[in-house]
Amino acid sequence: MKIKKGFVLREVCGEQVIMGEGLGALDFGKLLCLNETAAWLWNRAVGAGEFTVDGLAEDLCGEYEVSPEQARTDVAAIVAEWQKVGVVE
């Protein structure tokens, strides 16, 4: 998977929000606020170019004290949300 071109993480009123660059790509019904961990994962995914749930889960285990099973469950849920709003392909 990869992050679709044109979507970026921005801070809006103290919140980390995924949004489309340019007004044509912006759909306020599909803005997604991220917590600190999800924003960290987003930045890892952007930096990687291509990513997998397992790869991000492994990265998460290296950064936070979390079991591999819990990391995979959490990453899968976050990536599912990204897919739901159409920011990954």
Task: Label each region the model flagged.
Residues K30-E89:
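Long, charge-rich, low-complexity alpha-helical segments
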Residues M1-A39:
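Acidic, low-complexity/disordered tracts enriched in E/D and polar residues
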